[in-house]
Amino acid sequence: MLRRFSLFSLGFLGWLLVSGNASASFSSTLSEGYHTLSNNVAQTWNEPEHYDLYVPAITWHARFAYDKEKTDKYNERPWGAGFGVSRWDEKGNWHGLYLMAFKDSFNKWEPIGGYGWEKTWRPLTDQNFHLGLGYTLGVTARDNWNYIPIPVILPLASIGYGPATFQMTYIPGTYNNGNVYFAWARFQF
């Protein structure tokens, strides 16, 4: 019995030590991530290479996730515009700060602003062609939620040539809510 208790105690103590190290490691990872993010946002704001025009192009409600009666009523032409600043870092990745307003699914104005980052690849010998995958962190507000600010973390993907980029995201959701593909053109000046 004493032997089992000793083995259990040693195992529990080892678990506490490992979980303490994992917790410290997780905390330091979060801290490093926050510092990297805040430094990238500050550098993009203070040292922009480009001014960007955003032109919303399409919203598409995933038909498998909606009743037809709902999608028949939704607006899928998000008229609007936006403005931003951006830069390419030393690794060739894209960073941007943006503010955009567009007509949402109910044809009401929806503003969104935030920071976007994309890992960028240039797979062809023509370095003007680029592909990107990343994320955006921002805040939006919707009419059907009384324009209460709502934080968003969404994936980003893009395909572009030179200063013109077609950028997109997917808003996940539940049945008859969310599950929207949203895309826009971004022009760098």
Curated annotation (Swiss-Prot):
Keywords: Acyltransferase, Cell outer membrane, Membrane, Signal, Transferase
Catalytic activity: a lipid A + a 1,2-diacyl-sn-glycero-3-phosphocholine = a hepta-acyl lipid A + a 2-acyl-sn-glycero-3-phosphocholine; a lipid IVA + a 1,2-diacyl-sn-glycero-3-phosphocholine = a lipid IVB + a 2-acyl-sn-glycero-3-phosphocholine; a lipid IIA + a 1,2-diacyl-sn-glycero-3-phosphocholine = a lipid IIB + a 2-acyl-sn-glycero-3-phosphocholine
Pfam families referenced in this protein's UniProt entry, alphabetically: PagP
Top-level class of the enzyme under EC nomenclature: transferase
Cytoplasm recorded as keyword: no
Entry's Gene Ontology cellular component terms: cell outer membrane
Annotated site, Role in lipopolysaccharide recognition, chain positions: 70
Domain of life: Bacteria
Residue(s) at site: Role in the phospholipid gating: 175
GO biological process annotation, one example: lipid A biosynthetic process
Localization of this protein: Cell outer membrane
Molecular function, one GO term: acyltransferase activity
SUBUNIT field: Homodimer.
Entry's family note: Belongs to the lipid A palmitoyltransferase family.
Described purpose of this protein according to its UniProt entry: Transfers a fatty acid residue from the sn-1 position of a phospholipid to the N-linked hydroxyfatty acid chain on the proximal unit of lipid A or its precursors.
Protein known as: Lipid A acyltransferase PagP
